[in-house]
């Protein structure tokens, strides 16, 4: 793998997450009915950071949750082409709430579809929205993000690597040539 470009550094990532937080507040006219649900692995710390920014802006906490989808992603591995939803999902009650799924990269749409299915098994939300740090295209399902940090058109021979403090050493988004 060869590094092709650094797309976001730590400061650019913080600005991007701040913009997404503002867009979420604006589109939903506040945060009263919102539940942010991070898709494990890197969607969880991204959701936590967006929640912290929203709290700074609004002065109150947004409800947070997570969904654990074990995925042998088709852009990282060929072990399985389908995401596997574990029965360990932990999140707020979603009935009649606006659930905002948060993930690091939107690619084929399969992870998002599995997360939506997991949410629907837990209750019937008023609405489900999607926030992603990076949208790289190449959808295999009719999935579109409501909040996008950065659109990064890629070829299938490229890989987007999102690094998040807490899991990784730094905040950054890089593109690699395979």
Swiss-Prot record:
SUPFAM superfamilies: PRTase-like. It catalyses: UMP + diphosphate = 5-phospho-alpha-D-ribose 1-diphosphate + uracil. Substrate binds at residues 41-42, 103-111, 136. Pfam families: Pribosyltran. GO terms for biological process: DNA-templated transcription termination. GO terms for molecular function: RNA binding; uracil phosphoribosyltransferase activity. A motif (PRPP-binding) lies at residues 99-111. The keyword Cell wall biogenesis/degradation does not apply. Signal peptide: none annotated. Regulates transcriptional attenuation of the pyrimidine nucleotide (pyr) operon by binding in a uridine-dependent manner to specific sites on pyr mRNA. This disrupts an antiterminator hairpin in the RNA and favors formation of a downstream transcription terminator, leading to a reduced expression of downstream genes. Also displays a weak uracil phosphoribosyltransferase activity which is not physiologically significant. This is Bifunctional protein PyrR. It comes from Clostridium acetobutylicum (strain ATCC 824 / DSM 792 / JCM 1419 / IAM 19013 / LMG 5710 / NBRC 13948 / NRRL B-527 / VKM B-1787 / 2291 / W). The gene is pyrR.
């Amino acid at each position: 793998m060869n590094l092709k470009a650094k797309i976001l550094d730590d400061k650019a990532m913080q600005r991007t997450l701040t913009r997404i937080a503002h867009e979420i507040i604006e589109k939903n006219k506040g945060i009263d009915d919102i539940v942010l649900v991070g898709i494990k692995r890197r969607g969880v710390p991204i959701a936590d950071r967006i929640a912290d920014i929203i709290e700074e802006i609004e002065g109150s906490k947004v409800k947070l949750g997570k969904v654990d989808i074990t995925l042998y992603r088709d852009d990282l591995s060929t072990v399985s082409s389908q995401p596997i939803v574990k029965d360990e999902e932990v999140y707020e009650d979603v009935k009649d709430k606006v659930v905002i799924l948060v993930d690091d990269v939107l690619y084929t749409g399969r992870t998002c579809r599995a997360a939506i299915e997991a949410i629907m098994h837990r209750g019937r939300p008023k609405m489900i929205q999607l926030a992603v740090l990076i949208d790289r295209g190449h959808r295999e399902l009719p999935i579109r993000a409501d909040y996008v940090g950065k659109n990064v058109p890629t070829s299938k021979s490229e890989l987007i690597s999102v690094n998040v403090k807490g899991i990784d050493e730094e905040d950054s988004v890089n593109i690699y040539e395979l």
